[in-house]
């Protein structure tokens, strides 16, 4: 089963259709197909919070399983009516002016004769400036300035860390933690041993028991740094445990404030499930609150002004792209299939949450289309299709020839044609940016994905429960991460020659770790709902089979430990020094992993997650930020 299948949202009538609307009758994608409106409903299997399993006998006499998924919740008329004043050219002119002013701020920090620099806090100023533009999602405008600042900071870096300024001899926890995180993320060689030098005689991070704002900020940056850990870095594990405990205790003692908001956000989303656009939106609110309290300096106010304007200009582009996505979804004929989930708006929210570069529209649109196709295939293989039908479809995908649809049942013909045409169209578009035909790469990934799906369908059909290792290896392919990443990545304006592709696609460690995280995390959040739909095999059930006497809690603990270790491995694959494969070539695939992980963050029930996802769509796509 694919884990790239966003969960349902709670209803909100002013924005999208009511859950109580009547079930759509299946219509033809090519010709009339089996309709569930005439099916005889069977006895429901145990319900799973917001979706259960219903058996239905179609009018051709075939008994089918359907997931009782609700229809699309985001009304197409509402989406097509979206508008924004920030499309006007005057806003672009203002943006360019502000970009120039922020560059001047960066340059003043680097002035040899001092400028705004103070020898007691210049290193912290450089790092704070870089941190601000990155968290606000505007760093793409300042790559040259960021490198100058980080080169300057790194020139003072030592095995004991750094002080807040070039003339400060004593190591400063806040500056060292912030510096370690940013430098490591930008590919500089830094070692976690710097934190050993910040311990007291008892082997603990030295800090007072008082929760002062300055100390809390230092521990917050220590926590953020600890999340960029590599395997085997024990001091980073210690720092994470210590800082997380400290911050949770601090939340109990400090008043509700911008600082408490920042702590709550970082604790909730950490690094591996953080969406950059959601972080930008949240950090804008935090800095805005500081502005009201007159806690911001003039430079940060200028950066904030640019961030708000950039957010809203991209918001206007989001509206256009979302309209395009909605038209594609509608024209595909998928709205008439009532056995599939319709999550194109949620998928768009995810991808626009990880890539806010205006020129990457084709990447975002390709990602949404591919993820929606994955969801259609997931629902077809996991529930609706019979095993004989799925064997025919699997063979047709391998042949990659529309003439093979003659042997498919009617509902599969339409699915196949949309899949075939969409993938071919995207491959043709990708050839413009890659300078070569990439279709074979994508076909190989698609065949592996469909093959893994088919194996799981055979397991469901026969009632077979595999071993953990057998399930996990197959599950990495069926997670959908590889196929969801590969085709959209080719649409970027970044060349991906074969030697780079080998480092991010199958069978690279990078691809293996990303697929592993999605499969493991998806199973911990969805295994109960999957079992309710008749899908017994999961990481949890297979672990319990391999370890008689173990409980679900034992299985979850084991899998959560696997996830934590695999995240560290993926961090290392992203950030390891490699002159042949720059970080920028791996960043989109890594961010897709983070984005997909976000949708399974702390998810133990669809009701809570529904509200969270709904709010995410509204906050990052539908609503502009107040100016």
From Swiss-Prot:
This is Carene synthase 2, chloroplastic. InterPro entries: Isoprenoid_synthase_dom_sf (IPR008949), Terpene_cyclase-like_1_C (IPR034741), Terpene_cyclase_plant_C1 (IPR044814), Terpene_synth_N (IPR001906), Terpene_synth_N_sf (IPR036965), Terpene_synthase-like (IPR050148), Terpene_synthase_metal-bd (IPR005630), Terpenoid_cyclase/PrenylTrfase (IPR008930). Pathway: Terpene metabolism; oleoresin biosynthesis. Residues 1-36 form a transit peptide. PANTHER family: OS04G0344100 PROTEIN-RELATED. Its cofactor is Mg(2+); Mn(2+). One of its GO terms (cellular component) is chloroplast. Its EC number is 4.2.3.107. It is found in: Plastid, Chloroplast. Mg(2+) 2 binds at residues 378, 382. Its main location: plastid. Expressed only in resistant trees, not detected in genomic DNA of susceptible trees. Pfam families: Terpene_synth, Terpene_synth_C. GO terms for biological process: diterpenoid biosynthetic process; monoterpene biosynthetic process. Mg(2+) 1 binds at residues 378, 382. Belongs to the terpene synthase family. Tpsd subfamily. Binds 3 Mg(2+) or Mn(2+) ions per subunit. A motif (DDXXD motif) lies at residues 378-382. The gene is TPS-3car2.
